[in-house]
């Protein structure tokens, strides 16, 4: 991360203020302040993680994935009891993404749900949409199958199973 001395001074002051305002995370902010003040370039890369960029195409893909889960849940509600018994209800829960490898995606989902108020019916679970295992490849396969369904918001039990097993 390239920064002028003036930018480093401003960021250092921000970290100092944050350490005063948030005593629970004071050590974290003091550490970051030291890194910025002293210009430790190896460690300044950590700052890039906090200022990520999620392109519009990826944002739309995440929304499509969440919309697919919404459609699956609503379709499941419309099934009769006999058809619903053949659908694994646990697999209708949107788990989110892996914080270790898909952190930007987890944070975007949290933003959509918490800040934008979208998909309030999704259960955040204990891990707040951290699936604790990579999910993007699985969701992409599911999206392909879902998009091939003729009635995406009125899925049959068989279509639900095909999507989940993609």
Swiss-Prot record:
Q: Which residues form the signal peptide?
A: none
One of this protein's Pfam families, by short name?
Answer: YfbU
Cross-referenced InterPro entries: UPF0304_YfbU (IPR005587), YfbU_alpha-helical_sf (IPR023146), YfbU_helix-hairpin_sf (IPR023145)
HAMAP family recorded? UPF0304 (MF_00762)
Q: So what family is this one in?
A: Belongs to the UPF0304 family.
* Name of the featured protein: UPF0304 protein VC_1871
Organism listed in the record: Vibrio cholerae serotype O1 (strain ATCC 39315 / El Tor Inaba N16961)
Upper classification of the source organism reads: Bacteria, Pseudomonadati, Pseudomonadota, Gammaproteobacteria, Vibrionales
């Amino acid at each position: 991360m390239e920064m002028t001395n003036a930018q480093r001074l401003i960021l250092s002051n921000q970290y100092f203020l944050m350490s005063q305002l948030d005593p629970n995370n004071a050590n974290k902010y003091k550490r970051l302040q030291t890194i910025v003040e002293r210009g430790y370039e190896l460690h300044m890369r950590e700052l890039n993680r906090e200022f990520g960029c999620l392109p519009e195409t990826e944002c739309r893909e995440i929304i499509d994935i969440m919309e697919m889960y919404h459609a699956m849940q609503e379709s499941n509600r419309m099934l009769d009891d006999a058809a619903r018994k053949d659908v694994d209800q646990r697999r209708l829960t949107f788990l989110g993404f892996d914080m270790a490898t898909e952190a930007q995606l987890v944070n975007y989902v949290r933003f959509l749900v918490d800040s934008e108020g979208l998909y309030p019916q999704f259960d955040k679970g204990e891990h707040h949409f951290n699936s604790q295992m990579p999910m993007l490849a699985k969701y992409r396969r599911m999206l392909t199958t879902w998009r091939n369904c003729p009635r995406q918001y009125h899925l049959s039990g068989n279509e639900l199973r095909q999507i989940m097993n993609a």
